[in-house]
Amino acid sequence: MKNNLTTTITSGKFKSKKLSLPSLSTTRSTKSIVKESVFNSLQGEIYGSVFIELFGGSGLMAATAVSNYAKKGYAIELDRAAFNSLRENFSRLNDVNETLVALHGDTFELTPKILAQNIEQKTILYADPPFDIRDGFSGIYEKLYKMLEKLEANIVVIEHISSHKPSQNIGKFALYKSRKFGNTTLSYYTKCI
């Protein structure tokens, strides 16, 4: 049976384009109010950046970043069915420069490799791991923090369950802002100089 769930890009050059959403049994789509908050907060940072969406799902955040003139957008997704939706979404939006890249695999393995390929670029990481209350995902935030401690990026945004208290510092990153939206919170980190 074909999944008919969709979401819409609401700004930039892809405005009004629809993306297919993977099954809600395997992913949790970012709420519109949360997405809008991220892009309002990062408005001055997106242009010309490399935007990497960890735990990519439909690729909505990476696609919205490229829609708002990020140089390149990556989305990493492990679940095969979700990745198929992601790849289809990006193939409908991509231009000849292949500005959107869908990657099937483990976020914890692929993120350092993508960053290594874009070492000279301004990079923004957007992490939306499955909330740790889901089966098989306890400890996901600690695992994410451990990976981030070893990485170089300019900005990191983590979407997490509001009951989780985010770390003030993660390696070279310092928390500079949090915004709560009911059960979801966005925590913003910047690279300490």
Regions found by a protein language model. Name each.
Residues 56, 80, 109, 131, ...:
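Short, glycine/acidic-enriched loop or turn micro-motifs at the edges of active sites
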Residues 42-52, 107, 111, 115-127:
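Mobile, glycine- and charge-enriched loop segments
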Residues 114, 118-174, 180:
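S-adenosylmethionine
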Residues 1-68, 84-121:
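S-adenosyl-L-methionine
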Residues 72-77:
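Conserved SAM-binding motif I beta-strand of class I
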Residues 177-193:
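Core SAM-dependent methyltransferase catalytic element
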